[in-house]
Amino acid sequence: MSKVSSAVLRQGVATILKEKKERKFVETVELQIALKNYDPDKDKRFAGSVKLPNITKANYKVCVLGDAQACEAAQKENIPFMDVDALKALNKDKKLVKKLARKYNAFLASDSVLRQLQKILGPGLNKAGKFPTLLGKNEDLKVKINELQCQVKFQLKKVLCMGVAVGNVKLTEDQLVANIERSISFLVSLLKKGWQNIKCLYIKSSMGAPIKIY
């Protein structure tokens, strides 16, 4: 049972969409969370991902780290890819791996590449929070990318506040509301005491002011 008023949420989303301006980029809509009654040092730090009904970021870039079959499929669909030789060419250079991590929102990797990734690249992608998702042998590349584009990840680190991208200003009011409701519902399921651990919730666009919804 959500404690966020449907009317308050809709009003907040409507305000974000009404105040959006023409920009050179599509603004992301973020859910900002402040927790309470939680000790990151003592309590278990939660992490989890959920697939939302609609795409979160408008220009979500995915790169395939693949075997020959996956790279061929990526090339056909005009999706960026790197094979093992291209990855080895980075020579575990921390700056180059960091640059690669910054260039894309997410990575997909074939099983054979995933198993040797740490050895080839070092821990760079993992440190950037972009460890690749497994791309199975017979999985449809476009479907897999769509799943990533709709996915949001919650991870508690050392501080009791976090922000996650839950949509963008190109979505409709209904689409944004659906994404935000699903995100909040999943977040509550991760928390030790559910709603008792939530201090407040805000939504905001990249360039807009935060709007309190709880």
Curated annotation (Swiss-Prot):
Classification via SUPFAM superfamilies: Ribosomal protein L1
Localization, UniProt: Cytoplasm
One example of a Gene Ontology biological process annotation: translation
Pfam families named in the record: Ribosomal_L1 (PF00687)
Major localisation: cytoplasm
Presence of keyword Ribosomal protein: yes
Cytoplasm among keywords: yes
A GO term, aspect molecular function: RNA binding
InterPro entries with a match to the protein in the record: eL8/uL1-like, Ribosomal_uL1, Ribosomal_uL1-like, Ribosomal_uL1/biogenesis, Ribosomal_uL1_3-a/b-sand
Binding partners and assembly: Component of the large ribosomal subunit.
Function: Component of the large ribosomal subunit. The ribosome is a large ribonucleoprotein complex responsible for the synthesis of proteins in the cell.
Family: Belongs to the universal ribosomal protein uL1 family.
Protein name: Large ribosomal subunit protein uL1
Organism: Entamoeba histolytica (strain ATCC 30459 / HM-1:IMSS / ABRM)
Lineage: Eukaryota, Amoebozoa, Evosea, Archamoebae, Mastigamoebida
